[in-house]
Design a protein with these regions (language model features):
Chain B
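Flexible interhelical turns and helix-capping residues at alpha-helix boundaries
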Residues: 12, 63, 108, 153, ...
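Short loop-to-helix capping motifs
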Residues: 4-5, 131-133, 177-178
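Hydrophobic aliphatic residue packing
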Residues: 14, 32, 44, 126, ...
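Conserved amphipathic alpha-helical segments that form helical-bundle/coiled-coil interaction surfaces
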Residues: 70-152, 163-169, 181-196
């Protein structure tokens, strides 16, 4: 049972940072925390059913308003979902970098940050992931399907390109860096790349993915880092040339 | 102060419940505060990377990331910002950072908690000099998780002299626009911090990141 209005801010964090910027912890946050802990404790995975609202109300001993707010906080981030209809109710969702990206853009937008800032960040994260991927023992297997990119399929299917980069992020091994990189790359691809005509780039992009897949499969870390850096600098250069104003646009919150 | 609820209801043409939920979602990120009582209402807050860190740590937790991975990410990202700061920083601001470092070093020398207290301010100042607010925000979010969760169990106070010297040398390299040196020194400094954590907390750092 969680007492209404519980706050752990004062006691726990005071010593580290005298001016604590973090907002006050509300009951709904504490309930959300408890739901997350219980998902782990009960070994629930994506798609599993959570206890019903009625039983959670009893278990956590909070008001319906606080519980629903907790649900909503987790639902916005995609960690729980609601199955509609009879027999429906809260189920376990999944971790999607695009949801973290979306929340981050709220900060980026209010902070007056631009797509140019996002580009420079991607130029650091992506080559790092390529380098780290070279140390992963699964790299041959995971890169295999990208080794024989068929240039005739040309128009470098965007979904396929995204899949290639997803694999590299996951191969990087460090899940913090992988999530951050995926979030940045997702934002650039939906907000910038999806609005650009990439026809001129697509053939070379496909070939670059093939080369990258090869050097990563071979574990050539320095070369993978160099090629990945070149790969994104080429895309950014293309965008800079065609749509220079886009770089100074504020990152949108969607 | 944002417009009062009644004005927003009219402006956005939504139900009261939807508006309150929208405000609450933004409040959950610490970007607005809902002032209670008469004359209260939504107030625009500051943008604190610590709040993004709190949300991000939920993702880290669900994706199975460990504290060791968080530290590794920090050891990688912080030196990027030191390098950018040396490349781009305004010379006057960089010199101010050096002066601040020297003053702080004198002030906290011998105060066992002093270095730890000053560290977040130093790193934040470097981030501000970097000219890349996106990378700065993302790094500061990780730093906040590190401070809130790892520094609770690890005591760095016995290394304070070394850390203060490191900070001063990094600030000097930034002021001299020596990007390579700034990055090298920042990397060594962060690896040093990481080594202290590994030494003290060891296997505890292989646990999954908590959300709190």
């Amino acid at each position: 049972m969680i007492p209404e209005g519980t706050s752990d801010t004062a006691s726990a964090r005071g010593a580290m940072k005298p001016s604590d910027p973090r907002r006050v912890i509300k009951t709904s946050d504490t309930v959300a925390l408890q739901i997350v802990r219980d998902i782990k404790a009960r070994g629930l995975v994506k798609g599993d059913r959570l206890p019903s609202e009625t039983s959670m109300l009893q278990e956590y001993g909070v008001s319906r308003g606080s519980l629903r707010e907790a649900f909503r906080l987790l639902e916005v981030q995609g960690f729980i979902r609601f199955k509609p209809g009879p027999g429906g109710g809260p189920i376990v969702g999944s971790v999607e970098p695009e949801n973290l990206a979306r929340t981050s853009t709220l900060y980026f937008h209010l902070g007056g940050m631009t797509y140019g800032d996002l580009f420079s960040t991607q130029e650091l994260f992506e080559p790092l992931c390529a380098r780290l991927a070279c140390a992963n023992p699964d790299r041959h297997e995971r890169m295999a399907s990208f080794l024989h990119g068929d240039a005739l399929l040309g128009s470098a299917d965007r979904a396929d390109a995204a899949r290639f980069h997803d694999e590299v992020h996951q191969l990087a091994g460090n899940r913090v860096l992988a999530l951050y990189t995926a979030a940045v790359t997702h934002l650039i691809s939906t907000d910038i790349m999806a609005t650009m005509d990439l026809a001129e780039l697509s053939a070379s992009m496909l070939e670059e993915h093939r080369q990258l897949a090869q050097v990563i499969a071979d574990g050539e870390a320095a070369e993978a880092e160099r090629l990945m850096s070149q790969h994104f600098k080429a895309q950014h250069g293309y965008c800079r040339q065609r749509w220079p104003s886009r770089l100074n646009e504020l990152i949108e919150w969607r | 102060m944002l417009p009062p609820e009644s004005a927003m209801l009219e402006q956005y043409r939504v139900g009261r419940a939807s508006l309150r939920e929208a405000l609450r979602l933004i409040e959950a990120q610490g970007l607005i505060t809902l002032k209670p009582g008469p004359g209260g209402g939504p107030v625009v807050g500051d943008i604190h990377a610590a709040n993004l860190g709190r949300t991000a740590s939920l993702y880290f937790r669900f994706s199975g990331a460990t504290y060791r991975q968080l530290i590794e990410a920090m050891v990688t990202m912080d030196p990027w910002l030191a390098e950018l700061a040396a490349l781009r920083a305004d010379r006057d601001m960089a010199n101010e950072l050096v002066a601040l470092c020297i003053a702080e070093t004198k002030a906290v020398r011998g105060d066992s908690e002093g270095a730890v207290r000053f560290a977040p301010g130093f790193h934040q100042a470097v981030y501000e000099l970097s000219g890349n607010p996106v990378l700065s925000t993302m790094t500061a979010a990780i730093d906040a998780v590190f401070i809130e969760q790892i520094l609770r169990t690890v005591d760095l106070s016995s290394h304070q002299g070394q850390f203060l010297d490191d900070h001063q040398a990094i600030a000097q390299a930034i002021a001299n626009a020596d990007a390579e040196l700034a990055k090298t020194l920042a990397t060594a400094h962060m690896q040093n911090v990481a080594a202290c954590c590994y030494e003290q907390a060891g296997a505890q750092l292989d646990r999954r990141i908590e959300w709190r």
